[in-house]
């Protein structure tokens, strides 16, 4: 017969077991990346870690780590496993979207997540010097920079910035309303911009191209949904 006392005694044990299990998982997720740990990762595994992190973020199961402890551990060296080329939009912080911590990823952000020589040069440092295993070009829906490029906005230095996105506007295959007021067209251009950026990261970089050819680096594109938090990787 199961008594009230037995149940009351077991419940704390079950709860403690669950907490211990979560703590063990958190400890694994919170371990900082060393060069040995980074080099042991395949490029596919690096992408997989980002997918797993986004699943945690989108399902409300992010891992809580001691960030100050991580800052101290990484103060003398860094060995991130991936680099994210993202938009400067305040709603798309890559480290949070992929549930990564201090020292896990390089984050390169600019309005419209495009690639030009300074961004590509920064990524060559990440890939060749530091050894990241993957680059993700991360776009998002309802992007203001994409809308600005579609509308051919002229505004100070922003004009030159948006000029980097306009080729994606021109190359987007879309029949119908090609204005910034059409969210479907904006989404289509955003995805085309991501794909073009992915291509440019090897077309304009012999270093990245060689690493991809050697199987040491993967470069992929993805789109973030502002409402759900989910990231969809593009084929």
Where are these regions (language model features)?
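N-terminal secretory signal peptides and thylakoid transit peptides that target proteins
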Residues: 1-14
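Active-site cofactor/substrate anionic-group-binding motifs, chiefly glycine-
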Residues: 88-91, 95-113, 118
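N-terminal signal peptide c-region/cleavage motif recognized by signal peptidases
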Residues: 20-23
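Divalent-metal-activated hydrolytic enzyme cores
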Residues: 8-10, 28-77, 103, 112-133, ...
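Short beta-strand segments
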Residues: 85-87, 109, 136-140, 220-224
């Amino acid at each position: 017969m199961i008594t009230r006392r037995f149940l009351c005694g077991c419940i704390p044990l079950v709860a403690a077991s669950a907490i211990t299990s979560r703590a063990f998982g958190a400890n694994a997720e919170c371990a900082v990346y060393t060069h040995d740990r980074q080099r042991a990762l395949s490029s596919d595994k690096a992408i997989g870690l980002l997918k797993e992190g986004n699943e945690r973020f989108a399902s409300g199961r992010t891992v809580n780590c001691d960030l100050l402890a991580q800052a101290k551990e990484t103060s003398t060296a860094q060995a991130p496993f991936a680099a994210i080329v993202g938009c400067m939009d305040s709603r798309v912080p890559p480290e949070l979207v992929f549930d990564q911590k201090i020292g896990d990823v390089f984050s390169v952000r600019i309005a419209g997540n495009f690639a030009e020589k300074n961004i590509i040069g920064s990524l060559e440092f990440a890939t060749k010097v530091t050894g990241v295993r993957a680059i993700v070009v991360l776009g998002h829906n309802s992007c203001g920079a994409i809308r600005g490029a579609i509308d051919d906005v002229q505004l100070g230095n922003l004009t030159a910035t948006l000029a980097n996105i306009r080729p994606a506007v021109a190359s987007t295959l879309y029949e119908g309303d090609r204005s910034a007021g059409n969210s479907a067209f904006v989404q289509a251009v955003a995805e085309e911009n991501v794909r073009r950026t992915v291509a440019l990261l090897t077309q304009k970089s012999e270093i990245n191209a060689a690493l991809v050819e050697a199987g040491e680096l993967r470069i992929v594109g993805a789109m973030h949904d502002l409402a759900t938090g989910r990231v969809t990787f593009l084929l």
